[in-house]
Amino acid sequence: MDVGYAAEERAMLNARAEAIIADCPGVFPLIARGFGAEPQRDALVYLRTAADNAPVTTSGETFLGLLAAAAAWFRREGIGPDDAVSILAPNCTATSIAYWAAMGAAIVHPLNLLFSQEAIAAQVNAVKAKVLFAPPPGTPGGLYEKAESLLASTPSLKRIVVLPLDGRVAFDDETIEPDPNWRQRLQSPSASGAEDRIAALLPTGGTTGAPKVVRLSNRNIVASAAASMLAYKITREDRMLLSLPLFHVGGAFCSSLSSFAAGAALVIPTAGALRNPEVVAGYWRIIENQRITIGALVPTALGAVAGVPTAGADLSRLRFFATGASVCPPEIERRFLAAWPGDSVRQVYGMTEFAGAITSTPHDRAQPAGSVGLPVALVEVAVLADGIIHRGPSPGGEILARGPQTFPGYLDERQKGAVFHEGWLRSGDIGRIGADGEVYVTGRIKDVIIRGGHNIDPAGIEDAALAFPGVALAAAVGLPDSYAGETPMLFVTAAPGATIDRAALAAFVESHILEAPARPRAIAILDEMPVTPIGKIFKPKLREIAAEQAARDAIAATLPNVRVDICASTDGERGLALTATVPAGFAAPVRAALGSLPLPFDIVAA
C-alpha cells in the first residue's frame, strides 16, 4: 500500500475541494449540497440512552427544514450575521440545530462544557453574545445554572434559551417546525453570507487563563469540512459515530460537517457520549446496531473502549477509526486493535486556528509508525529549521501550515503575536516531513499541556504556585500518562531561607485552580531550576525530568523490586525519548511497561 500521493492525485484532490468551496461559500449551501439529491436519507440519529432501540432520527429533508426555521427564529429575535450566539450544551438533536443554524445565520460561539463559571463569563463578555443556549435546569454539571447567572453581569446577553435533551427541537417552549421551503432559503450561495464572513468563534488556549477566541470564516470552515470528507472518502452510504463535542474542531468540522457535506448520517450516542459509562460499556453494540462505518475517538477514549469486550458484536461495516487531539500512544492503539481488527487507527493532526485537520492518513493509504499522515486537500506543510523553510523531507523543526483553512486572527488581535511566519501558520509543534510527504510530530515548542484532548495553559498553574509563601520559581509541564497522554506536573524552587511543605503547596494550588484537569498530578521541589543563558526557565529539561518520573512509575507498578536506570533526552529526529538500562531477563516486561507511555524509547542491557 502506498504512503504518499502522486502529483496527479494531489492535483485532483485539490481540484475537488476547490469545486466544493466555489459552489458552497457557507455552511447552509454545503449541507444542502450533501442532502439535496436524496433528502430522505438519515442526517442525524440521536440515542437518548445507550440502549435506545428507537432513536430520534432526523432525515436530511427535516434537518434542512429545521435549519431554515431556526435561522428565521434568529432573525425574529433580532440576531443578525454579525451577532454572536453562545452555546453551552451537550450534543443532542436540538443542540445540533441551534449550532448549525447559528453558524449560518449569525456567529456561533460554542463553549467548553468544562469551563468554570468565571471562564464562561469571560468568554461570553468577550464575544458580546446576545443569546446563550443551555440545557434544562438540573442537568448534571450545572450548565443551566452557570448560564443563568450571567444575565446580571453580561450587558450584551438578552436571554438564556433552554434546549431539551430528549430529542425534541424547541427553543425554550417554542417548538421549531421544519420549513418546507428550505431549498430556496438555504441552497442559494449567499444563504450563509460571503465566504469571508466570520461564522464561528471558537475558544482555544485551554480551560484556564485569559479568553482566547479564534475567528473562523465561512471559507475556513467549508475548506476544512471538504478536506476531511475527501481524505476519508465519506459518501452518503456512511454512518459516523460522533463522540467529540461541537466546541472542538474535531467534532464540529472533521466529523459532523464533513458527514453532512457528503450526505452521510451522524449518530450521537447520548448527550453524555463517552462520558456516559453506559455508552462506553455498550460501545461495540452501538456500532453494530447503528451500522456505523466511521468512528473517531481521542486517545483517552480509545483506551477506555479498548477494554470493553466486543461480545460478538458485528463490526463488519466499520471502515476505519480516527484519533486526534493528541498523539495516540502505541500501546493504546495496540490494545484497541486487539478489540477491533482494523489495520491501524488513523491519526489526525490539526489546530483550532486551522479550522480542523492539517494532516490525516486516508484509510486507503499506509500509515508509517509514528506518522500523523499527509497534508489534507489544499494544505501545504513545511518545517522551519534554523531559519530555513523546508517544504520537502526535512530535519526536525517547527511545523508550519498554510491553506484556505488558515484563520484570519483572534478576536483580540493583541494575542496574535508571532503566530505567522512569512505567510505560514506556526503550529508551535516540533516535527519533520518524511520521504513520502508524511508528517511526524515529535514535540512542542508551545507550553500548552494536553490532557485527554483538553488544552491546559500552564500559566494558571504556575501563577497559583507562585502565590504560595516561599516559592521562588514555578513551572508546569506535561507528565507523560498512559491514559490521558499527559497530566500537569509542577516544578518549584524555594526562596532563599524558605522551606516548602509539599502537601501544603499541593492543597494551596488545588484550591486556587478552578478546573480539575489543570490541577497538578505531581509536584517536584528542585534545589535549582534549569534556566537558559538569559535566565528563562528551560522547560525541555523539565519535560525530560517528568518523562523519567513517568517511566520509573510505570516500571515500578509491575516490577517494584527491579532496578532500571532511566534517561530522557531530546533531539530533532525523535523529540523527547527514553533510554532504559535493564538487567538481564527483564527487557520484555520493561518494554511492556514503557509501551503504555506516549514516548519513543530504547532498551539497552545493563
Predicted feature residues:
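Conserved AMP-binding/adenylate-forming
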Residues: 269, 297, 321-324, 328, ...
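Conserved structural elements of the adenylate-forming
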Residues: 63-70, 214-235, 243, 253, ...
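Structural core segment of the AMP-binding/adenylate-forming
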Residues: 106-177, 601-605
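Conserved pre-ATP/AMP-binding loop-to-beta segment of ANL
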Residues: 22-24, 39-42, 162, 178-203, ...
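Conserved AMP-binding/adenylation subdomain of ANL enzymes
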Residues: 222-239, 249-293
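Conserved AMP-binding/adenylate-forming core of the ANL superfamily
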Residues: 23, 43-92, 96-99, 116-121, ...
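AMP-binding/adenylate-forming catalytic core of the ANL superfamily
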Residues: 115-122, 132-134, 295, 403, ...
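Conserved AMP-binding A3 loop
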Residues: 56-62, 199-223
